[in-house]
A protein has these predicted regions:
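Bacterial N-terminal signal peptides that target proteins for export
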Residues: 2-13
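Terminal leader/tail segments of proteins
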Residues: 26-171
Length: 171
């Protein structure tokens, strides 16, 4: 094959490869669809409603270690990004080594207002994506961190066992 014929072929090949990568990343950044609700719960401290939580899975049931899972939190009050990150780090204490928490977490947890929704989607491959009001924020590929993050709400020894039971559809 002459050099003149190879260049157009390589250009077309590169264009197709880039298009495939672009479509894959676009598909992964779309808000998850087709999941069934497992359970829901309201999280309150004293008399303050903080958020409503809903958990979704492929078939509407929760089985530890299985994915995909989608956790949606709809907030009832304003909370700064810094407060969300700090509380997340506090809740991860004992579940995940603080030094190993991905630095991107600071960029992925936005400030929220009353009515805002923050969602975390754990894919079957262990990657986790964050969404804010349905808009893709970014993802973390650390499957150990992603599981520990969901365990804040789903672990048998979570700080709020009633919330955990309801999210798992047990009440």
């Amino acid at each position: 094959m002459s050099a003149c014929r190879v260049k157009p072929f390589l250009s077309v090949y590169l264009l197709v490869a880039l298009l495939c990568v672009s479509l894959t990343s676009t598909a992964q950044s779309r808000y998850p669809q087709g999941l069934e609700q497992v359970g829901q719960a309201r999280f309150s401290l004293l008399w303050l409603d903080i958020y409503d939580a809903r958990l979704f899975s492929a078939d509407g049931s929760y089985r530890p270690g299985e994915a995909p899972l989608l956790l949606e939190l709809t907030y009832h009050r304003a909370i700064s990004s810094r407060e969300l990150v700090d509380e997340t780090l506090n809740q991860l204490e004992g579940r995940f080594e603080r030094a190993a928490v991905p630095g991107e977490l600071n960029d992925l947890l936005p400030s929220v207002d009353d009515g805002d929704q923050l969602a975390f989607y754990l894919r079957a491959d262990g990657a986790g994506a964050f969404y804010f009001n349905g808009k893709y924020l970014g993802e973390l590929d650390d499957s150990d961190f992603n599981r520990a993050f969901l365990d804040i709400w789903l672990a048998p020894d979570s700080e709020y066992p009633e919330l955990t039971r309801r999210l798992k559809g047990k009440e």
